Amino acid sequence: MNRYLSTIELEKENMTFNAGHTTIFSATEREPLHGHYYQVFTSITAWVSDNGMKFDYRYYKKRVGELCAQLNQIFLMPMYSPYLQFSQDADYYYFKFNQKTMPFLKEDVKLMPLTNI
């Protein structure tokens, strides 16, 4: 059988989340804290196998839905911003920006391996 590439596109109602963030523009400027409604669309390209399938796409639908659930109703903060320092204690993250400290309950925050959001 000739092998060929094909693309599967996944989009479901559970592939959404609401999350807050702030975009940091410089050492002294940032957006106010605010949130967005995100819809996730996944496109996967792979070789089609002899049975006419690429893979069991149900795994990816489930996994993306689980990731969206983890990000739902959470505040996203970048871990690697050059303008944002953070410390923590047992219950809180303390984010320091432009000489001001913003405390957040740890359960309300997801630290992202990014420089900005």
Question: Model-flagged regions — what are they?
Answer:
Residues M1-I117:
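Charge-rich, low-complexity N-terminal segments
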